[in-house]
């Protein structure tokens, strides 16, 4: 039946009036059946696995991240727009799989979560394929060549790196820009020097920054989410410092001013977690001894919120820690991110119970996809490993240098440098970029040594942008695009090194 339909399509396209539509018939035929094209030059290998089937393996590898995108976006949307502080409190204090699924089944409903997630993700996926596919077909007809299969993966990657609240027309504009300017302008699939999906996202990021960062990570209606959060904070009688918000870990990291030091978040953490010892304990005890002369009987790890704020914001000369009062709420938020408190726990970051772009939240889903890509040899393990190790090393390097340059266990160094290195691998789009974006075989280097250099370069830039650059909260997108630009240089260096060894 399917073969007859394809044959009918070929008969229509072979007519002189419709010959320009031949690329469409060829695309449908090769998608459904084994290609019948005979190569014009050796090697002559008979194999049913053509590029389209190769691309399908990448699509299969993306399935865990797609499911995670649907599930997490649906759950977060229903919780954050509920206007019910009890549900929000229960959600934020989930610990373990049993309590997580118990909460979902009792408070939300599995069907409701999946339905809400599909309403968010599927329209973006449809727009990506419809608009991107139209661009591909138009260029194939104009150039009179076959429709390339690159969009099969690009069309799926693109919606996974978008925030759930992105307007549909912006999503369409972004994929059109990515396909046309990022790929077709260079000659089409296999000729592009930049990753098309990331090119489209970068275009949206710099053209419509307010829609690509900030409070854009929950549901499909940002205004409704803001009203719901305000209502829940009011009903729960939350203060300005502990009110409900939709800030991501990277937003907090980026927005925290340099005046927030390690000693400030250690003081806050010692009270929130009741820690008897923190890395800057000696500095805390020295300052607290002077400050507590007016408050006999108090201990540094047993302060009320008002007392803690007073201690942290009192001038250093008077025994306090010298933080500006306006920055106390930033210090509280960063403490949660650095110490993994509440919604920023390591489990939430790893399994994806956090806010972010649709497909970038779940590290474990990305790792499942990585397993298939590595098993089939589609992705380079050298690129993945060097990217991950480089990011980990430089996150640790900034922390160590902060300690060495300031002394006192880094007490007076900016607190953002002390987020654990392993947590950098689980926040933002690092895991997704490492597995699916940096390993793009077209825009990444071909030589083995070049892959090591390429991955290390991207990892370094990612951490540098996250910790040093105040303008952009996330560095993965820009780092990979810059890595794409320098990929030929890395190949050239590797080739020269190879020739020298041969000589």
From Swiss-Prot:
Topological relation to the membrane, as annotated: Multi-pass membrane protein
EC number of the protein: 7.2.1.1
Catalyzed reaction equations: a ubiquinone + n Na(+)(in) + NADH + H(+) = a ubiquinol + n Na(+)(out) + NAD(+)
Keywords (A to Z) from UniProt: Cell inner membrane, Cell membrane, Flavoprotein, FMN, Ion transport, Membrane, NAD, Phosphoprotein, Sodium, Sodium transport, Translocase, Transmembrane, Transmembrane helix, Transport, Ubiquinone
Gene Ontology terms describing biological process: respiratory electron transport chain; sodium ion transport; transmembrane transport
Cofactor requirement: FMN
Top EC class, one word: translocase
InterPro entries noted in UniProt: NqrB, NqrB/RnfD
Any GO molecular function: oxidoreductase activity, acting on NAD(P)H, quinone or similar compound as acceptor
Pfam families recorded: NQR2_RnfD_RnfE (PF03116)
Keyword Heme on entry: no
Sites bearing FMN phosphoryl threonine, chain numbering: 248
Transmembrane regions listed in the UniProt entry: 55-75, 120-142, 160-180, 186-206, 361-381, 384-404, 417-437, 452-472, 475-495
GO cellular component: plasma membrane
Highest taxon of the lineage: Bacteria
Compartment annotation: Cell inner membrane
Role noted for this protein: NQR complex catalyzes the reduction of ubiquinone-1 to ubiquinol by two successive reactions, coupled with the transport of Na(+) ions from the cytoplasm to the periplasm. NqrA to NqrE are probably involved in the second step, the conversion of ubisemiquinone to ubiquinol.
HAMAP family hit by this protein: NqrB
Family note: Belongs to the NqrB/RnfD family.
Quaternary structure note: Composed of six subunits; NqrA, NqrB, NqrC, NqrD, NqrE and NqrF.
Record's protein name: Na(+)-translocating NADH-quinone reductase subunit B
Organism: Chlamydia trachomatis serovar L2 (strain ATCC VR-902B / DSM 19102 / 434/Bu)
Lineage of origin: Bacteria, Pseudomonadati, Chlamydiota, Chlamydiia, Chlamydiales
